Amino acid sequence: MTDKPAVIRKRADFLAANRGLRVARPGFVLLAHPNQGQGQRYGITVTKKIGNAVVRNRMKRRFRELLWELLPQQGLADHDHILIGREGGIERDFGKLREELMLALRRAREGKGDPRRRRRR
């Protein structure tokens, strides 16, 4: 069995990943950014807009399990992978989330990201 990917804990690494490739899905947004040979790493962000602590932690547990399962085989080598939870993600079936993450990782490997959203001012 392969080792689990490392966890991103520093804010600077999360901000750097925001400059990388972005792949949006109904349940989450995947960010992928090269990390200068530090191996596969992952981070999870779920904002308070999603729900209370119980709901956010449940979503993070589901994302963590998916990343442990899929990143070693399908993730980008020497990249940081960030999953940002969306409101629809908590109600989605686990199998559906897995399919969406597999598709998002495939699109990231192909370099096919989604356009950035314009910020409201």
From Swiss-Prot:
Keywords: Endonuclease, Hydrolase, Nuclease, RNA-binding, tRNA processing. The keyword Transferase does not apply. It holds the Pfam family Ribonuclease_P. It catalyses: Endonucleolytic cleavage of RNA, removing 5'-extranucleotides from tRNA precursor. Its EC number is 3.1.26.5. One of its GO terms (molecular function) is tRNA binding. Belongs to the RnpA family. Consists of a catalytic RNA component (M1 or rnpB) and a protein subunit. RNaseP catalyzes the removal of the 5'-leader sequence from pre-tRNA to produce the mature 5'-terminus. It can also cleave other RNA substrates such as 4.5S RNA. The protein component plays an auxiliary but essential role in vivo by binding to the 5'-leader sequence and broadening the substrate specificity of the ribozyme. PANTHER family: RIBONUCLEASE P PROTEIN COMPONENT. This is Ribonuclease P protein component. It comes from Erythrobacter litoralis (strain HTCC2594). The gene is rnpA.
